[in-house]
Curated annotation (Swiss-Prot):
Highest classification ranks of the organism: Archaea, Methanobacteriati, Methanobacteriota, Stenosarchaea group, Halobacteria
Record GO cellular component, one term: cytosolic small ribosomal subunit
Function field: Binds 16S rRNA, required for the assembly of 30S particles.
Disulfide bridge positions per record: none
Protein name, per record: Small ribosomal subunit protein uS14
Species name: Halobacterium salinarum (strain ATCC 700922 / JCM 11081 / NRC-1) (Halobacterium halobium)
UniProt gene name: rps14
Free-text remark on how the cofactor is bound: Binds 1 zinc ion per subunit.
One BP annotation, GO: cytoplasmic translation
Keyword Ribonucleoprotein set for record: yes
Binding annotation for Zn(2+): 17, 20, 35, 38
Cofactor(s) the record lists: Zn(2+)
GO molecular function: rRNA binding; structural constituent of ribosome; zinc ion binding
């Protein structure tokens, strides 16, 4: 049984970027829910460190 967009919204399983609203390329680990572009912009201010 395939799930349509309408069904996913009803069950609350769709996620979007908290900052810009984009639905693709989400970083959901640790319930961050930011798209990868927004994550790259604000990761340092969230306490993440970049190694090499």
């Amino acid at each position: 049984m395939s799930e349509t967009d309408g069904e996913a919204e009803e069950t609350g399983q769709t996620h979007e970027c908290r900052r810009c609203g984009r639905e693709q390329g989400l970083v959901g680990k640790y319930d961050i829910w930011l798209c990868r572009q927004c994550f790259r912009e604000i990761a340092r201010s969230m306490g993440f460190k970049k190694y090499s």
